[in-house]
Amino acid sequence: LFIKRVDTIEFARKNKLSVQVAARDLRYQWFEELRIKHGFDGVATAHHLDDQVGTFLINLARGTGISGLHGIPVKNGHIIRPMLFASRQEIVDYSRENDLPFVEDSSNIYDKYTRNRIRHHVIPQLEKINPSFREGLNDTILNIRDAEIIYKHAIEMARNSIVIVRENQAIIKLVDLLNLNPLNTYAYELLSPY
């Protein structure tokens, strides 16, 4: 067990971040330090289905492109999240049945954080409409991930045929770009790197 205390509020202030984003950044920096120090291949986090659903709904509410709707990845660099299939309650029940300690972030009880308002108020309302809402949304997230792969492939194919990079210049074949549909999406994706 590794424990570290940090001044999240000061880090957030210095870096102009929300406390939640600062806490996440500090946590992942520390995970990477531990991974390197101890020679670990990776670090597993306890993110679960409820986190996945909450992340999707936060991004949906704030407005996002397709990449913001693919949810929390199972693997991202050296971070793996093997519990995304299980709900928080399933993990709590399993822990109790097997006499395992269950540890929860104390900030999860406060409604001052958007993710908690969604967990405590929005998701229960959606489950009144569909008791299997979490599982259904998880299936949707997996479908969006597949669609994102196709989307990125289409953008890359268009980039390879329309964008010519020479030295420090990007030349766009405008006539070919104007023939793409939907034009706004292609134009955004092709031009945003420049």
Question: What do the PLM-derived regions correspond to, one by one?
Answer:
Residues 119-137:
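Conserved anion/nucleotide-ligand pocket segment
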Residues 34-37, 129, 194:
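Alpha-helical structural context
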Residues 101-103, 132-137, 151:
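Short, structured loop/turn "capping" segments at alpha-beta junctions
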Residues 6, 26, 75, 138-194:
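AMP-forming adenylation/ATP pyrophosphatase catalytic core
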Residues 62, 66, 88, 127-131, ...:
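Alpha-helix boundary/capping and short turn/kink residues
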Residues 108-116, 134-145:
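Internal, active-site/partner-interface "lid" segment
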